[in-house]
Amino acid sequence: MPRPVNALIVDDEPHVRVLIRVLLKQLGIETVWEAPDGAAALDQANAHKPDVILLDINLPQVGGLEVLAKLKAAHPKIPVIIVSSQSTMKTVIQTRELGAEAYVLKHAPKSEVLQMLSDAFDNIAEGDAADAGGPVSETPAPPAA
């Protein structure tokens, strides 16, 4: 899969969703769905099957870690990028263990968030190429024995 063309933003803060939407537009993502909580995130993911999900950890009612686990169980091939203000190593490790592809700090300067998202999208595209048997690096495979 090339870089994502649509996305689902899951964050309970409307101004954060607007900011992420603007950054995604700068990266060429025009179709964006939004969810203010975990239940809505699951509904939106089921309805739209987005190319990528951007998920906050601090959500009302159902926490982001539980939402991440449910999203990955229901849609294991949809990449999830955590976009959170939490920056503890424990949280980062937990999200990676649950299947998140990347972790972006939302309170970093906008230019850094934009670069982190761009890098994450590139990594997702490269990972999909590897899953499809496409090239991941310039190193040739060793000859078959």
Language model segments and positions:
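CheY-like receiver
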Residues: 122-145
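C-terminal output helix
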Residues: 90, 108-117
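Active-site beta3 strand of CheY-like receiver
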Residues: 48-54, 59
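Acidic catalytic/metal-coordinating carboxylates
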Residues: 37-40, 63-66
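Two-component/phosphorelay signaling modules centered on CheY-like receiver
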Residues: 14-33
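The feature encodes the CheY-like receiver
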Residues: 60, 88
